[in-house]
C-alpha cells in the first residue's frame, strides 16, 4: 500500500542523510529532494494538493507547485520556508556555481569550450536557468526567477506567471480524476 511505501521511502532518505553525516561530507554536499508536477487526485487523500487547486494535466497551481527540500549545512539556513518561483533546470547553474563555475549561463550563451574526456567541444546554447545560490544562501532576498510559463503535456502554453500575477490562456474545466486526461483544454478568448 501507498502508506507503507512512503514510510519505507522516508526511512531510506533518512539513512542516506545519516550516512552523509557519518562520512563527514554534509557541508560539502547539497541534497535536493523534489518531485515531479502535481499528484493524481484519484489517490486521495494521499495525492492531495492542498492548499492549491486541482491536479496533474490542468492549468491550476495544484498541477505545477511541488514541495522541494534542500539541505546544505553551513550554507543554507535550516528551517527556511520559501514560496519563491524556481524551476528544476535552475539547479544546473546552481550546482555548477557551488562547484566554482558561477558564470556558466553567460559562457554557454557566448560559446564555451568543454573538455569531455579528451574530446573538446564548443557548446553555444541559451538555457532558461538561473543560479539560485545567492538566494539560497541568503545573499539576496528573492529568487532571480520572476516568471513561469505553464505548459500542458502536449506542450500547449496554458498560462504565464509574473511575480504574483497569472494569466491563463487555456483552462481545464473538467472536475475529477482520470477524466481530466480525456477532456481537452478550453482556449480562452481573452486571458
Question: Model-found features: residue ranges?
Answer:
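Active-site regions of oxyanion-processing enzymes, predominantly non-cytosolic
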Residues: 1, 21-30, 61, 159
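Generic beta-strand/beta-sheet core signal
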Residues: 32-34, 71, 168-170
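C-terminal cap/loop subdomain of S1 sulfatases and analogous C-terminal strand-loop tails that border
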Residues: 39-61, 76-80, 84, 89-191
Amino acid at each position: 500500500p501507498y502508506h507503507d511505501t512512503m514510510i519505507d521511502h522516508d526511512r531510506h532518505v533518512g539513512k542516506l542523510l545519516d550516512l552523509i553525516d557519518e562520512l563527514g561530507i554534509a557541508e560539502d554536499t547539497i541534497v535536493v529532494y523534489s518531485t515531479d508536477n502535481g499528484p493524481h487526485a484519484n489517490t486521495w487523500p494521499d495525492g492531495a494538493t492542498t492548499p492549491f487547486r486541482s491536479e496533474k494535466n490542468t492549468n491550476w497551481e495544484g498541477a505545477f507547485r511541488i514541495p522541494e527540500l534542500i539541505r546544505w549545512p553551513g550554507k543554507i539556513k535550516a528551517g527556511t520556508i520559501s514560496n519563491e518561483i524556481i524551476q528544476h533546470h535552475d539547479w544546473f547553474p546552481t550546482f555548477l556555481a557551488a562547484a566554482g563555475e558561477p558564470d556558466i549561463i553567460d559562457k554557454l550563451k557566448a560559446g564555451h569550450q568543454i573538455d569531455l574526456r579528451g574530446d573538446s567541444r564548443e557548446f553555444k546554447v541559451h538555457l532558461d536557468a538561473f543560479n539560485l545560490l545567492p538566494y539560497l544562501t541568503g545573499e539576496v532576498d528573492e529568487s532571480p526567477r520572476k516568471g513561469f510559463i505553464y505548459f500542458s503535456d502536449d506542450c500547449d502554453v496554458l498560462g504565464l506567471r509574473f511575480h504574483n500575477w497569472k494569466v491563463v490562456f487555456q483552462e481545464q474545466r473538467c472536475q475529477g480524476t482520470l477524466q481530466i486526461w480525456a477532456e481537452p483544454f478550453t482556449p480562452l478568448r481573452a486571458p
